[in-house]
Amino acid sequence: MSSKEAPMRAWLKMAGLAMSNKSWLSLGDFAGICAKTPLPMCFVVQTSSLPGGSVGATHYDRTHMNIGMVPRCYSRTVDIANTAIFQLGNAFVNILALCVILIISYNIRFKYTAIGRSEYGYFFQLCFMLICMTLVVDCGVSPPGTLAYPYLAALQIGLAGACSWALAVMGFLGFRLWEDGTRKSMLIVRGVSMVGFLLGSLVSAITFTNWIQHHPDMKTNTTALFVVMYGLNGLALLMYSVCQLVVSIFVLSNFWMTGSTILGVIFITTGQVLMYTISYEICEGVKHYLDGLFIGSICNVFALMMIYKTWDISTDEDLEFSVSISVDGDIMYNSNLKL
């Protein structure tokens, strides 16, 4: 090796080591996310590596204020009837989502003999509660800086975990590992969703409480919160998607179900990617009337619709059966009913 090549190799080695260290240090750091996307939890965490372009790093000293990281651009507040409403566009989408969930729940109740009817009804009840809590923390019912805000944000994260973990368990219903609709089945779904709720809410509450007590230090350890929000919940959604694809292709051979599952994955993935990557560009482009949360919420609504449609398709024909009562009072089942 020549004398000219030695410094170049050493420089490349040092650069690679620095990049590796940077990637390890960025694990669990919400600085890059919160600089672009106004997530509710961003207002109750802090980091020592705020990007220089963020509002919080350049425009004011946050050590004397009871808020965490502020994004560079976020949806403007609207004053209606002497009431400040945050995230107005996102609020309209979430209200629409509540209406969609009510319609879906109504349809689920009338599919009396469908497989997973009770489990999916419970899942959409969790989704309804999650969206209600999202309206509370997003729209300023309890604005950032109040004492209740960190705990409400923790409840929102916990409900998101409950929905994700319940969905993961429901993905196994198509394999008939246990009888659906029974006390055992509901105990499994509710128990797993409760674990997801407790894990998400407790980790969030502990993280936010640590910030409340030490926020003048300008840093919060958010690694556990990052792992729970994006690691475990993402793994649960992946498990559901894989199970539905396996059931639709190899068990039912129903490619309409496969298509609806793939559409749901596309919607949720697209919404998350756009929300975390181009929220700032969206906000600047529409003069602060909307931001990435609006796009993410719309995609989440379509993903919920695809979850219902996937279940609806899977229970449309061969998995339906009729129930009747004979003259002697016996309950008769007919599994050959075609709808």
From Swiss-Prot:
Keywords: Cell wall biogenesis/degradation, Endoplasmic reticulum, Membrane, Protein transport, Transmembrane, Transmembrane helix, Transport. This is Chitin synthase export chaperone. GO terms for cellular component: cellular bud neck; endoplasmic reticulum membrane. Chaperone required for the export of the chitin synthase CHS3 from the endoplasmic reticulum. InterPro entries: Chs7 (IPR022057). Belongs to the CHS7 family. It comes from the Eukaryota. Its main location: endoplasmic reticulum. GO terms for molecular function: unfolded protein binding. It is a multi-pass membrane protein. GO terms for biological process: cell wall organization; chitin biosynthetic process; endoplasmic reticulum to Golgi vesicle-mediated transport; protein folding; protein transport. It is found in: Endoplasmic reticulum membrane. The chain crosses the membrane at residues 84-104, 121-141, 155-175, 192-212, 223-243, 249-269, 288-308. It comes from Eremothecium gossypii (strain ATCC 10895 / CBS 109.51 / FGSC 9923 / NRRL Y-1056). Interacts with CHS3.
